[in-house]
């Protein structure tokens, strides 16, 4: 039984066996060991406890315990952060309520007084101090509230006027374009 050279076994004991110098039991054990795998196929070497010393196994247990403790600490931190956020929100609400109690933003004013105030605004958008003091007495408001109302109304009014102005310019330009007018001379 001659095999090609490239098919010859790599184990020296097998070379001797093929050459006719058998050692009996030794070869059978070598072949038996060669056929058996070092570990059964269903056993994962990473999960095997036999490969690790007790110190390594204890280290894994400590690592697992540290992982659980770490998760616990993370949960505690998250709960603490959530609690802090809730406290901040409650404090913010309390501060806003206190501000509203100190300085009520809106007071109910009759429509006729509001029309009067609006008429004063149309006549003079920036009242003098004497005018604003007389208005504050008339409307039973503070000087600060009157000046704030004028400031807010002025902002709204100016914004509305700029929108209208822009619309007028845009509409004027569109109407000119629709009639055939353009800014660039027509090329013929």
From Swiss-Prot:
Top-level division of the source organism's lineage: Eukaryota
GO CC, any one term: nucleus
Annotated segments matching region Disordered: 28-106
Leader sequence residues: none
One of the GO BP terms on file: regulation of transcription by RNA polymerase II
Annotated DNA-binding residue span(s): 102-161
Family matches, as InterPro entries: HD, Homeodomain-like_sf
Protein name as annotated: NANOG neighbor homeobox
Organism of this sequence: Homo sapiens (Human)
Lineage per the UniProt record: Eukaryota, Metazoa, Chordata, Craniata, Vertebrata
């Amino acid at each position: 039984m001659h095999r090609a050279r490239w098919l010859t076994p790599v184990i020296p004991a097998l070379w001797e066996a093929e050459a006719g110098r058998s050692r009996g039991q030794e070869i059978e054990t070598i072949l038996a060991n060669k056929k058996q795998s070092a570990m059964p196929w269903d056993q994962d070497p990473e999960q095997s406890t036999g490969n690790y010393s007790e110190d390594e196994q204890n280290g894994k247990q400590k690592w697992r315990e540290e992982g659980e403790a770490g998760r616990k600490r993370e949960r505690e931190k998250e709960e603490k952060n959530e609690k802090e956020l809730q406290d901040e929100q409650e404090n913010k609400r309390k501060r806003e309520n206190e501000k509203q109690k100190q300085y009520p933003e809106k007071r109910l004013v009759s429509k006729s007084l509001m029309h009067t105030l609006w008429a004063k605004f149309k006549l003079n958008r920036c009242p003098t101090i004497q005018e604003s003091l007389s208005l504050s007495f008339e409307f039973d408001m503070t000087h600060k509230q009157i000046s704030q109302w004028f400031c807010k109304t002025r902002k709204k009014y100016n914004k509305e006027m700029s929108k209208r102005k822009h619309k007028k310019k845009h509409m004027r330009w569109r109407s000119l374009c629709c009639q055939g007018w353009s800014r660039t001379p027509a090329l013929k």
